Amino acid sequence: MANYYTDIPELKFHLNNPMMKRICELKERNYRDKDEFDYAPLDFEDAVDSYDKVLEITGEITGEIIAPNAEGVDEEGPHCANGRVEYASGTKQNLDAMVKAGLNGMTMPRRFGGLNFPITPYTMCAEIVAAADAGFGNIWSLQDCIETLYEFGNADQHSRFIPRVCQGETMSMDLTEPDAGSDLQAVMLKATYSEKDGCWLLNGVKRFITNGDANLHLVLARSEEGTRDGRGLSMFIYDKNEGGVNVRRIENKLGIHGSPTCELVYKNAKAELCGDRKLGLIKYVMALMNGARLGIAAQSVGLSQAAYNEGLAYAKDRKQFGKAIIEFPAVYDMLAIMKGKLDAGRALLYQTSRYVDIYKALDDIARERKLTPEERQEQKKYAKLADSFTPLAKGMNSEYANQNAYDCIQIHGGSGFMMEYACQRIYRDARITSIYEGTTQLQTVAAIRYVTNGSYIATIREFEAIPCSPEMEPLMSRLKKMADKFEASTNAVKEVQDQELLDFTARKLVEMAADIIMCHLLIQDASKSSELFSKSAHVYLNYAEAEVEKHSNFIENFDKEDLAFYKK
């Protein structure tokens, strides 16, 4: 049977990145748990070995249980009866296998029953699961909502809720409403404090809630009467055991059928405040969404891998004109670009997760003791990098998942249009990745300030100073010219000092930055492992160079007066 971890050597390569040493030191507090928990690592090598073993177990479960169940889960889907959700039979088997393997609450401290994993190996598990069944990946990976409760909840909430998630209970984040999608400050679900009940009561409707009948919900609701903006919103914890929330319906979706997307009705649902009032959107949801966006980036990479695998296998097997179609330039060109996007996107994903790991670990340490000046500087540096890289990782990987799924079907030809092949499910599942947890357009909004304030070009120039292998030096020379064009395009737009023009060209500028950053990461990876990444580094740079040139030419020849041609 396939193992979705050991079959992908690129994953182990990223697990062994040099930054992991610092990440483990911070996450393990210099390995202080070893005297209290027999499964805690003794040192860095022991920690990485533990991550490797858990990833192998995840890969095995994914290959032997989740992947074989995927087609049946897609066809059956979840059911809704009497206000409750019942998962597809295959989903139940998947969850049972993951719980028995102890793969829940993975990033939580051991004192709560967690594994105390950094975000990076956990994200690898999420990628692996999504490659087999993206819908199930949603249900399982929503456990990372507990990060927000851990970060902002109180000690009593920690002791009551975190162990339950570590034991396998599921979570959801209830944000969206019929009139509040991307514009979450329009949320109107009402939260009223009841002196009689000694808790908050929630009333209203939530829509498009992934895994909406979960055991524990993080809910965004309006706690401040008379407000209509984000400052009137707070975050609440709703426990399904309390009752008061019913599933009105499960949405009939294009893809991710195994994941129940629900409309929820709250009727005096008892809930408790998480953190402080009025900070629900402006602080807590932003943290929650950044974690979710990293998760969708991982899901997207998993889907890209699945699409590439299906396309490659079919191209090797399918014969036309007396030879396998993989031998035709039109086909091997598509496959090479698919692999280049996959490797580039994965490099960006795990560079981002490592940045998140360092600043999150330092945040956690800061709740225990005062950080040293050096640690505060390190925390600030990696928080900024994580914030700037997260929208790139989510935006680019979700687009690449869709592109790879499209090309996978194209490689299959007419067979790809038939429901008998897995590529149609991958195509349907991938489509949502560039929509939920913030559309690609919203990722651009989040990223553009790092274009205009010089953060991306500063990071790119730092990457240029990193030595590369002799094989990669010609690519690096071309890459520096690409960076010059990006910088010139940025300056050209800024000099006009027109907000509408900046908004209009923002996606092109953000994609230029992302393309160049991913090229750098691939060159760094290929310099360490030519066998794994040299081909993708060459292929992806050829692709990215053409993309940067295209965007550069557009911006150079575009005047703000041209905006009128695009308006109805």
Residue ranges with predicted function:
Residues 2-5, 9-10, 17-19, 256, ...:
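Alpha-helix capping/hinge segments and adjacent helical runs
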Residues 199, 203-245:
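A short core secondary-structure module
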Residues 343-394, 490-504, 523, 527-531:
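C-terminal helix-coil-helix/basic helical segment that borders enzyme active sites and/or dimer interfaces
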Residues 241, 248, 260-292, 309-326, ...:
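A glycine-rich, basic-preceded beta-loop-alpha segment at the flavin cofactor/substrate interface
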Residues 1-81, 85:
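Extended, charge-enriched "interface" segments that sit outside catalytic cores
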Residues 59-60, 90-163, 167, 210-212, ...:
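Internal helix-loop-helix
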Residues 454, 466-568:
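C-terminal amphipathic alpha-helical interaction region
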Residues 154-160, 439, 445-487:
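A structural-propensity feature for long, helix-poor, extended segments
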